[in-house]
Curated annotation (Swiss-Prot):
One of its GO terms (molecular function) is protein-L-isoaspartate (D-aspartate) O-methyltransferase activity. InterPro entries: PCMT, SAM-dependent_MTases_sf. It comes from Salinibacter ruber (strain DSM 13855 / M31). Catalyzes the methyl esterification of L-isoaspartyl residues in peptides and proteins that result from spontaneous decomposition of normal L-aspartyl and L-asparaginyl residues. It plays a role in the repair and/or degradation of damaged proteins. One of its GO terms (biological process) is protein modification process. The keyword Methyltransferase applies. Its EC number is 2.1.1.77. The active site is at 68. GO terms for cellular component: cytoplasm. The lineage of its organism: Bacteria, Pseudomonadati, Rhodothermota, Rhodothermia, Rhodothermales. It catalyses: [protein]-L-isoaspartate + S-adenosyl-L-methionine = [protein]-L-isoaspartate alpha-methyl ester + S-adenosyl-L-homocysteine. This is Protein-L-isoaspartate O-methyltransferase. The keyword Glycosyltransferase does not apply.
Length: 230
């Protein structure tokens, strides 16, 4: 079940309060705030939880997965530095909420999810709301080479280390005056917690990357199918 115009009116003030909460928590990118505020988050959660849809909290979506806390979505999106028409790969479609936010920012979004049931559900909601997201069922640690290179890659699950295929699929800088190339935002660490990390591609060589670390978060684990994840 997707949102309706009457739903939008019902939840409008809750969305506005959520945006103010994110601003108070340190999200200052107005484009990101506008995008989060434009997405009908209640459409991505179970109907029984819709009264909590605009609280700044993660909510269960089944299969031991969650729809990310809005602050986390806004934080990662701000670090990614999304520009209109950027080609963005999302690893971990989940509910589809992050993909919708990226679409609101004008990105071309490609999203991978390893749980087929979640992907079908997210696909239905995204289509119902009119978001143009290309999706794929598969192992996100391998990226999606067919549509690479990407201006940005966002990983919505915690990883013990950065998957090399994702680095290789970042766009190279196009010239000396154009600054760094593609950006990867990924939480790195064990199951007990991760450090939000941003990697920028700075050249065409195997070591031409710059890495920055930011705040601590706690995500569900990113599973590599070669390691026996189920």
């Amino acid at each position: 079940m997707t949102a309706t115009p009457s739903d939008d009116r019902k939840y409008r003030h809750q969305r506005e309060r959520l945006v103010e909460t994110l601003r108070e928590r340190g999200i200052h990118d107005e484009r990101v705030l506008s995008a989060v505020g434009a997405v009908a988050r209640h459409a991505f959660v179970d109907p029984a939880l819709r009264d909590r849809a605009y609280a700044d909290e993660a909510l269960p979506i089944g299969l031991n997965q969650t729809i990310s806390q809005p602050f986390t979505v806004a934080y990662q999106t701000a670090l990614l530095g999304v520009q209109p028409d950027d080609r963005i790969l999302e690893v971990g479609t989940g509910s589809g909420f992050q993909a919708a936010v990226l679409c609101e920012m004008g990105a071309r979004v490609y999203s991978i999810e390893r749980h087929d049931d979640l992907l079908r559900r997210a696909r239905s909601v995204l289509d119902g709301l009119g978001y143009d997201v290309r999706t794929r069922h598969g192992d996100g640690t391998r990226g999606w080479p067919a549509f690479a290179p990407y201006d940005g890659i966002v990983v919505t699950a915690g990883a013990p280390e950065i998957p090399a295929p994702l680095l290789h699929q970042l766009r190279e800088p196009s010239g000396e005056d154009d600054g760094p190339g593609g950006r990867l935002v990924i939480p790195i660490g064990g199951r007990e917690g991760q450090t939000m990390t941003r990697v920028r591609r700075t050249g065409s060589g195997p070591h031409d990357y710059e890495q920055e670390e930011f705040h601590s978060f706690r995500f569900v684990p990113l599973v590599d199918e070669d390691e026996g994840g189920g």
